Design a protein with these regions (language model features):
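Basic, often amphipathic N-terminal segments
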Residues: 1-77, 92-180, 193-212
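Generic recognition of long tandem-repeat/solenoid scaffolds
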Residues: 81-87
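Small/polar glycine-rich anion-binding or flexible loop at a beta-alpha turn
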Residues: 182-190
Length: 212
């Protein structure tokens, strides 16, 4: 059982590395998970409608070609790295479209978010001044100017195994490496309990056409 390890990575190691990403599902975050101000059906319906309106304001596009990259994360009070798929930099039009969509999701959906409790703030430390400002205002620290689109593939990597896992994933993902990603929809995921995996609720097509 469990996730299938790419060739060159032991099953037990891959099960550990895939545990956190599997909890969230294969995705790229545009608006970080948050608790609703109210769990009423009306609140959830209003959130769905707001998501639909955001999606309707944006046209679909292709990202720059994807590549595998190590990104940094604080884990157990130390700086660690994890692997993610990210678009190559330098495509101004694609980057502008991504930034606009992310900004819309962050700002327009924030009215549905319950305030963070102190535990949520504390678990993000250490933070820079800008990260703390974002966290307190928007519920997440890597947003707006600090946002970077990425598709998380692993949890924190053991330093002595990072190169091995990276090489194995590069080979496993050869069909998608150096290929663009079609950005044609956004999805709303829900979670009834923080211990349970996320569940896809609704998919919204990016529906803007023409210059409107």
């Amino acid at each position: 059982g469990g996730p299938v390890a790419p060739a060159g990575v032991e099953h037990d190691l891959w099960t550990t590395l895939a545990k956190t990403p599997a909890h969230y599902g294969l995705h790229a975050t545009l608006k970080a998970p948050f608790e609703l101000r109210s769990t009423s059906e009306g609140m959830l319906a209003a959130l769905r409608e707001a998501c639909r309106k955001v999606a309707e304001r944006h046209a679909s596009w292709l990202t720059a070609p994807l590549r595998l990259q190590r990104l940094s994360v604080h884990s157990d009070e130390r700086l660690a790295s994890f692997l993610a798929l990210v678009p190559r930099q330098g495509d101004a039009a694609s980057e502008s479209a991504m930034a606009a969509l992310e900004r819309d999701c962050v700002t327009e959906l924030d009215r549905f978010r319950a305030p963070l409790d102190q535990r949520d703030v504390d678990r993000r430390e250490p933070l820079s001044r800008d990260e703390r400002r974002n966290l307190l205002r928007w519920g997440y620290h890597h947003v707006l100017d600090l946002f970077r689109f990425h598709i998380t593939l692993t949890g924190p990597l053991p330093p002595e195994r990072a190169a091995q896992v990276e090489a194995a994933l590069n080979q496993y993902l050869e069909p998608v490496i150096d290929k663009p990603l079609a950005m044609d929809s956004v999805c709303l995921f829900c979670q009834t309990d923080r211990a349970l995996p996320f569940r896809l609720t609704t998919r919204f097509a990016l529906a803007r056409t023409g210059n409107a």
